Amino acid sequence: MATELSLSVQYGVADARLPRWRLRRWVQYALAGAAGDGHAGLAGAELGLRLVGLAEGRRLNREFRGRDYATNVLTFEYGTGPDGVARGDIVVCVPVLAREAREQRKTLLDHAAHLTVHGTLHALGYDHIKAGEARRMEALETAVLARMGIADPYLAA
């Protein structure tokens, strides 16, 4: 995991299960996975990661995506500069994350790891709008999570 990482973690809501060190570790795994998937020239990443509640999650989703509900993860990709450093912000709505984990019969930590990896990959330019892009991104997420000992998040529980 050689890619340099500057990660700013902000807590709009606190959750003792999601300390900075754990979030940082998940982001580092995602960066390592991306480096092995064609992002070898990535010199580093400067990312913000904010954990929010329902009201803030809903406001941000409405303001930036025109959708009036809180979503699980929002990513703002700012691109990779000439210095090879990718920049972006990731917002995880903790109540949505917790609800989805229960509904999907996953542990909160496994689902939080998945959403953190997913958001990090978006910050690096991955997307899932087109079918081919979605397959590539989901395969990479699955591989990264497997390295962490987490089951394929796309298999039905």
From Swiss-Prot:
<keyword id="KW-0255">Endonuclease</keyword>
<protein>
    <recommendedName>
        <fullName>Endoribonuclease YbeY</fullName>
        <ecNumber>3.1.-.-</ecNumber>
    </recommendedName>
</protein>
<feature type="binding site">
    <location>
        <position position="122"/>
    </location>
    <ligand>
        <name>Zn(2+)</name>
    </ligand>
</feature>
<dbReference type="GO" id="GO:0006364">
    <property type="term" value="P:rRNA processing"/>
</dbReference>
<feature type="binding site">
    <location>
        <position position="128"/>
    </location>
    <ligand>
        <name>Zn(2+)</name>
    </ligand>
</feature>
<keyword id="KW-0698">rRNA processing</keyword>
<dbReference type="GO" id="GO:0004222">
    <property type="term" value="F:metalloendopeptidase activity"/>
</dbReference>
<dbReference type="InterPro" id="IPR002036">
    <property type="entry name" value="YbeY"/>
</dbReference>
<dbReference type="GO" id="GO:0004521">
    <property type="term" value="F:RNA endonuclease activity"/>
</dbReference>
<comment type="function">
    <text>Single strand-specific metallo-endoribonuclease involved in late-stage 70S ribosome quality control and in maturation of the 3' terminus of the 16S rRNA.</text>
</comment>
<keyword id="KW-0690">Ribosome biogenesis</keyword>
<keyword id="KW-0479">Metal-binding</keyword>
<dbReference type="InterPro" id="IPR020549">
    <property type="entry name" value="YbeY_CS"/>
</dbReference>
<keyword id="KW-0540">Nuclease</keyword>
<keyword id="KW-0862">Zinc</keyword>
<keyword id="KW-0963">Cytoplasm</keyword>
<feature type="binding site">
    <location>
        <position position="118"/>
    </location>
    <ligand>
        <name>Zn(2+)</name>
    </ligand>
</feature>
<dbReference type="GO" id="GO:0005737">
    <property type="term" value="C:cytoplasm"/>
</dbReference>
<dbReference type="InterPro" id="IPR023091">
    <property type="entry name" value="MetalPrtase_cat_dom_sf_prd"/>
</dbReference>
<comment type="similarity">
    <text>Belongs to the endoribonuclease YbeY family.</text>
</comment>
<dbReference type="GO" id="GO:0008270">
    <property type="term" value="F:zinc ion binding"/>
</dbReference>
<keyword id="KW-0378">Hydrolase</keyword>
<dbReference type="Pfam" id="PF02130">
    <property type="entry name" value="YbeY"/>
</dbReference>
